[in-house]
Each structure stands twice: as structure tokens, then as C-alpha cells.
From Swiss-Prot:
Domain of life: Bacteria
Reaction(s) this enzyme catalyzes, per UniProt: pseudouridine(1915) in 23S rRNA + S-adenosyl-L-methionine = N(3)-methylpseudouridine(1915) in 23S rRNA + S-adenosyl-L-homocysteine + H(+)
Organism: Nitratidesulfovibrio vulgaris (strain ATCC 29579 / DSM 644 / CCUG 34227 / NCIMB 8303 / VKM B-1760 / Hildenborough)
Primary location recorded for the protein, binned into one broad class: cytoplasm
Family to which the UniProt record says this protein belongs: Belongs to the RNA methyltransferase RlmH family.
InterPro entries, per database record: Alpha/beta_knot_MTases (IPR029028), RlmH-like (IPR003742), tRNA_m1G_MTases_N (IPR029026)
Role played: Specifically methylates the pseudouridine at position 1915 (m3Psi1915) in 23S rRNA.
Compartment(s): Cytoplasm
Protein name per Swiss-Prot or TrEMBL: Ribosomal RNA large subunit methyltransferase H
Lineage: Bacteria, Pseudomonadati, Thermodesulfobacteriota, Desulfovibrionia, Desulfovibrionales
Quaternary structure annotation from Swiss-Prot or TrEMBL: Homodimer.
Its EC number(s): 2.1.1.177
Cellular component annotations (GO), alphabetically ordered: cytoplasm
Amino acid sequence: MRTLRILAVGRIRTPFWQQAATHYMERIRHNCRLTETVVKDGGAALPPTARNADEGARLIAAMGPTDIVVCLDEHGRNMTSRDFAGFIERLTENATRTPCFVIGGAFGLDKSVLQRAEHKLALGPMTFPHEMARVVLLEQLYRADAILRGAPYHHD
């Protein structure tokens, strides 16, 4: 069974994104061990740079020594769903390390977090709200698992 981790800034507040995230987390957990760690948002009164630094420090503190840090970033690598499935398969070959997908807050990820990344992944060329990005990531993790299992979820 694959082990995956999501490390994100802030809880999902919008009800329909909460429902979608719960839906995919429940589906993923039938075949994968998935944990989610949520760190507190930076202070809303802080300027974006200070807020990112604050959130970045929390994210780094929550990272484990065996995490394979994969940051979601608009400048990251774009992949097809099949490529992403292969990427997940390669990352989970070593059972002593855990892929940890890191999602920033409203202003993205601090450079200190991006410097810790072993991989940077883009969900596409467009920018998404961080709540939506979390749901898209969850769906793609579920899809990748279905592809790797040969389940009839993904259609080319």
C-alpha cells in the first residue's frame, strides 16, 4: 500500500471544496495510506511577504526527515495524468521515504519552502485558489492510483 502525505496551509473553509476534498480522501484511503497535515495560515494583517515567511516556517517545521518534498508551484513541472501516475510509482518505490505534497496559502509558497523541494509540480499553466488546488491534487492522486491499479477510472 502506497503512503502519501499532503502538507497544506490553512484548512478548507468553503463547504463545496470541503465536500470534494473529503470525497477524494475517502476514495484514496481505500488503496493508499494518506495523511494530511494542515498548518495555520499566516496573519491576515501581515503583508504578503511576511505572511509567506510565517507560513513557510510552519511548513518547514512540519516536514519530516523522510519526506520527499514535492511543492505545488506554478513554475513546476507539468505532467499528464499518466506521467503523474508514473511519478507517484517512482516516488513510492522506496518504502523508507514518503512523498509529501506541499500546498501554499493564498500567496503561494515562501522561497525557503521551495528551496527544500526535491520536486516542483504545476497543476497547469493557470493559477488556482489554494482550496481548489488541494481538491485537484487529491483527484489526481486518486486518478494516479487508479491508473497504477488498472482500475477503470481514467480514460485516455
